[in-house]
Amino acid sequence: MGNPARKFSKARRDSRRAQTFKLSLPGMVECPNCHEMKLAHRVCKKCGYYKGKEIVAVEK
């Protein structure tokens, strides 16, 4: 197996590793019923609707 020719500094090593562990924002979309931002493919926490149907009864 090949060995590194010279030592990588900790900063260079860490900056290289950081590229593979980037955090991405979750997919947020606007609820078509109440126009609040919600996670995609999930029931809206504000109104309880998903795909035009009331899934969860929310007290108003």
From Swiss-Prot:
Coiled coil: none annotated. It holds the Pfam family Ribosomal_L32p. GO terms for cellular component: large ribosomal subunit. InterPro entries: Ribosomal_bL32 (IPR002677), Ribosomal_bL32_bact (IPR044957), Ribosomal_zn-bd (IPR011332). Keywords: Ribonucleoprotein, Ribosomal protein. It comes from the Bacteria. Disulfide bonds: none annotated. GO terms for molecular function: structural constituent of ribosome. GO terms for biological process: translation. NCBIfam families: rpmF_bact. Belongs to the bacterial ribosomal protein bL32 family. This is Large ribosomal subunit protein bL32. The lineage of its organism: Bacteria, Bacillati, Bacillota, Clostridia, Eubacteriales. The gene is rpmF.
